[in-house]
Amino acid sequence: MDRFYFGCEADDSTNAWAFDTKNNPFNAELKTLFGSDVGHFDVQDMAGVLPEAYELVEESKMTPDDFRHFVFENPVRFWGETNPRFFAGTRVEKEALAVLRS
């Protein structure tokens, strides 16, 4: 599953299934990419999208580590492994490089 990623809406509770390896074939962890929903008609305040996604942690459907993979590490690997300079000059450059080197 190393090169298989899929995008997900921020508030979709089924995102948690990707990290529930006991229910996935071959005990695989699927690589989800946070889809922010910011462009949706029903998003009136962009600042609320990420906290809404974090409700999956608050409801014990995802661990904090799962959430970090969902919103940061998986997207970094998706874009950074195909273009190692993708994050150059951004606020997350240092953290992204650390993920790519791990």
Predicted regions and their residues:
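Mid-to-C-terminal alpha-helical segments outside catalytic/metal-binding sites
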Residues: Y5, E9-K31, H40-S102
